[in-house]
Structure formats: C-alpha cells, structure tokens
Amino acid sequence: MKYSELAEVYTDVAATSATTQKETLLADCFLDVYDNTETSLLPVTVRLVRGRVFARWEAAEIGVSTAGAADAISKATGVESEQIETWWREEGDLGDAAAYAVDDRVQQTLTATPLTVTRVYETLREVASYEGSGSQQKQRDEIAGLISDASPLAARYIVRTVTGSMRLGVGEGIVRNALASAFLDMSDDAADAVQRAIDLTNDVAVVAQRVAEQGQPGLDDVDLELFRPIKPMLAKQAESIQTAVDELAADPKHIERNHNIELSHSGAVLIEFKYDGIRAKIHRDGDDIRVYTRRLSDVTEQFPDVVSAARDHIDAKHYIIEAELVGYDPQSNDDTPVTFQTLAQRIQRTDNVATIAKSIPVTTYVFDLLALNGESLLTDTLEMRLERLNTILSTKATSDSKSASTHNAHSSTSVTTVSSDQYQSSSSLRRAQCTWATTQTTAAEFYEDALAAGHEGVMIKNPARPYQPGSRVGYQRKIKPTMEPLDLVVTRAKWSEGRKSDFLGRPYLACRTADGNLAEVGRMHTGFTDDQLETFTNRVEPLIENVEGREATLTPAVVLAVEYEEIQISSTYDSGYALRFPRLKQIRHDCDPSQADSLERVERLYEQQSLDESQTSV
C-alpha cells in the first residue's frame, strides 16, 4: 500500500469535525486494508492513524526534535532552513512547511524508492533505535530519505508523525468505534469489547489484528500479560467523606442478589492512605521483576531497591501488584514523605542510580493484586483481591496495615528492609495503611491520621467491585483538602525576559473536554523556581509547533499539578472558566494528557466551591 493513499485518508478525516464521519472513514480504511493487502498491514495502519509507531507499553519513542525534522526537510528538498522556518511560523505546522518544501524543492530525486506504508513505519521504528555518537545525524538522514521520495501530502504526514502532532482529531475512542464498526456490529457491547481489549493490551494494533481475524471470540480471549503494563484504574473526587461512605458501602442484599458474592465486610468501605508518590505496577515472572509507572514507562533500572524489596517480601514468583512508591529523606527523624517533585528525580536519572537511591529512598506501599500465578484477578472483587494479596506478603510487610479498631497513623512504624546490602538501609515494602469503616466518624478519624502523617488524604473504595483498567470509576473516591490541585495540560508558553530570557515559562493550562479535545482554564504567571524553569524549558522546547513573538504553541504532552485560590466564570478561555492565581505544585512526569483532569471536574469543583461559599455566608 502506498503511503500517499493513507495520507489521503488522513486528509479526509482531518477535514471533518463530525465524530461519526471520522469513524466511518476509518472503518472503511481498515476494511480496505484488511481485504486488499497483506494481513500484517492492518495493525501497522491502525497504529499510524494514532500517530505512533510503537505501542504505549513499548519503551521507545521516535525521539526526533522539531529542529531535527526541519533540518531533514531542508536536506531532502534543498530549500533553505530560513524559508522552512518562515513557512513553519506562518502556518503553525511543520508538516505544512514540509509539504510546501517538497512542492518547491530545489533538488529532484532521480531514482526514487517507492514510498509504502511499511517502509515509513519500519524506517521510523529504526530511527528510534539509533544511539551514541552521530545518532542524531543518522536520524535526520533517514527522515530526509523518506521526504525525498514523498509527495507534498505524504511529506506533511511523515513530518507530523515524527513530531507527534497528527492534527486529525482522532482519539482512542474514534479508533475503537471504527474497529467495532468494521469488524463487529458496532453495538455498544461491541465497542465495549474492543475497549476492554485495548485496556488489557495497551496496543490497539494487536486488538485490530485479533478482531479482524477472529471477531468477538478473539477479543474475549484477551487477558493480562506479564510485562505488558495496563493503565491504572482511577478514582473520582468525593464531595465529602459522608457522601463517599454512604454511596460506596457494599449493600449485602444487592451484592448477594446480583453477584452471588459473600463479603466479610458487608456494609463497609475500605479506606486507604492516599500517598503522594509514584504509582507503579510490579510484574514478576520467576527471577525477572519489572517496575512500570502509570504512564507505562519501564523504570526498573531506576528502582533496583523496589525490585529487591519485592523479591524479598512478596512470597510468589508470578504476579502483578499495584503500589505507590513514596520517597523519604534519610536525614529526617520522621516518616514525612518528600515532595513528588523531589521523588521524580529518581525517574529522570538513569546514572548514579545507587547514589540517588540512598539519597531518596522509597517505601513501596502495596495496595492491590491484579494477577497471581497465571490467573487474572481483574474480575474479582476488591476484597477477594486483597485477601489473596495478604497471603503473599511477608509478616513485616503486612504489619503496617491498619485494623478497624486502630486509627493512630504513627502506631505501626516498623520498616521492612531488603536483604540486598546495597539497599539495606533505604528500602522497605509495606501494605498500604487501611481500615474498614461503616461510619463517617471512623472514616473522618482515619482521614485526619493520613494528613497528620504527611500524606495527601484517603482513598475510599467499594470492596465488592472489580478492577477496571484505564477508567475513572465511580466506586472509588479520593478525598484531599480543598481546593485540591488540578492536573492540567500545557498548551502554550512564553519566553521569559531579563536574566531568564532563555527559558520558557508562564504556561497556558488546559483540561480535557468530553470529546477528547482541550479547553484552556488559565495561565500561570508565577510558581517556578529557577531549577523548575530550566526543567520545564527542557521538557517543552522540543514540543514547539509554532512561535509568534515570544509565545510558543506546544504539542500537548506536559502535565502540571496546579494549585489555585478559586475557580471563576470567565469568557477569556474557551472552557468558560479561569483559575485565580494558579501556581505550580509539581511537574507531573508520571501523567500524560489523557490522564489530566476533565472540564466536567472543573465544573463540579466550581459548583462545590459556590455551594461552600453560600453555606458560609448564611
């Protein structure tokens, strides 16, 4: 299949704003590819439509900056870099600049190699593998080779794929529905089956292949796999402790009637400390243990102490466990955790791992078990999963778990050290502190304990529900002090002035909308330290899509945790809301835009804020 044919589909999809029309166009494309090309091309096409050449769980990226892509365009076409930058600035899209350059190319390719979908895909995957001296030049040469053989339209989408900005308006939901329409009956059940398979594989290409070849039975067979991480189940914000306890307490009659389950804690909720750390999944298969973040990044090398703790204090050889990695200051005399920003240094550093592990030791707080000895536990109730979890944790690891009759957060302070000499003084693994509660009083006391121990708040969970990866579910709630921070996506930033003129700052902040787009809710003017400003600039500079004056439009990829005074109604931003005095809490290295807070949540916080104000004034 010629890449230009796929580029034409891209153009048609980008031209319509109607979701159903996008789904129809993609469904037709997927069917045509499956019926008229080699079978292996369907998963490649589906992945490229999402602007990717790797699955989310693969630890790889194309890794070419916009500047590198611009150099490749110039090399392929002979057009001066200054002209390419002019087009880029005028159009706000380096892909458009590539199309203009190919159309206006100075040098012509005499013996062009056919530009197929397979060639583009395999070349971009190869580009990501280059390392060491001269790797950047090799990357640019390979991309220039693709552009040299491309039409203007094909060049536009090659460059957009390289820079991670397809501009198709196609999210995971549209691809899901297109697959359900193409290969199933497009009922709600069909779309749900495709979504379940995507959640369990984190690879839409694998799902496409299965549903095309095997239909519904192929999706039903999809299950958890070791070393293929899944997205976490997320909790909704609770209006109050009382509301959460009332709504989530397991109704024994409902459970027995609808699920044939007997609960040991009928009418109760599970309450856990909410830790401000790195959410992680620990996979073990025999001697091989891997650690993954909520963004599915493999951070095993950065956390050898976590690996050692898991090996020594989890009595099983095949499992997937979920935990929170919480950092501590070894020089401190208490267990107050370090900030997430400090802990995040451990993800960012891949050198001197032993040194930084000792300077920022972590405790691994285990709170869920998703698979054990080859058996997926996702459909089991939370209570059943925790019972299985307790059977494989060492005595010391479970000693920190809270009983329903104990609420002093400092009463269990034993530290479980690992056997490895290198990390013996700094590693621990504990069961997340938790209790069962049937009343608001019990829950409120435990919440105060969590805050007193320096943690974020509490999680309140219905014990009778399964694990649903990738979803923000209503049967788990989080409670933190108000106004709690929002996780927001950076869409624009401005070059600073004076001594900080080399840095980008003052970012515009956006939340997710129901249709998968972004809506801005404010702009941050303060809150960066010099170190944070440098880190922020290094993170967003490769994401620049367009520059007007001192303002840069960015590919939405960076998420910030933002604190603020209040939420106001505003016509300044397209969300209809504005944050008053937003300030940086931390750069969320562990969070991607799909996990940012929603406009619905901003609206709910505004309504709750208004209600609180009216009650205060009475």
From Swiss-Prot:
Cofactor(s) the record lists: Mg(2+)
Residues passing through the membrane, by range: none
Instruction: Give the span(s) annotated as Disordered.
Output: 396-422
Q: Write down the chemical reaction(s) this protein catalyses.
A: ATP + (deoxyribonucleotide)n-3'-hydroxyl + 5'-phospho-(deoxyribonucleotide)m = (deoxyribonucleotide)n+m + AMP + diphosphate
According to the UniProt record, what class of enzyme is this? ligase
| Active-site residues, record numbering mapped to chain | 274
Q: Name one Pfam family in it.
A: DNA_ligase_A_C
| Record EC number | 6.5.1.1
**Record keywords: ATP-binding included?**
yes
Q: What are the entry keywords?
A: ATP-binding, Cell cycle, Cell division, DNA damage, DNA recombination, DNA repair, DNA replication, Ligase, Magnesium, Metal-binding, Nucleotide-binding
- Indicate whether Glycoprotein appears among the record's keywords: no
Gene Ontology MF term list: ATP binding; DNA binding; DNA ligase (ATP) activity; metal ion binding
Locate the residues binding ATP: 272, 279, 294, 324, 367, 472, 478
Which GO BP annotation is one of this protein's?
DNA biosynthetic process
Q: List the residue ranges forming a coiled coil, or say none.
A: none
Please give the InterPro entries that the UniProt record associates with this protein.
ATP-dep_DNA_ligase (IPR050191), DNA_ligae_ATP-dep_bac/arc (IPR022865), DNA_ligase_ATP-dep (IPR000977), DNA_ligase_ATP-dep_C (IPR012309), DNA_ligase_ATP-dep_cent (IPR012310), DNA_ligase_ATP-dep_CS (IPR016059), DNA_ligase_ATP-dep_N (IPR012308), DNA_ligase_N_sf (IPR036599)
According to its UniProt entry, the function of this protein is described as:
DNA ligase that seals nicks in double-stranded DNA during DNA replication, DNA recombination and DNA repair.
- What family name appears in the similarity comment? Belongs to the ATP-dependent DNA ligase family.
UniProt protein name? DNA ligase 1
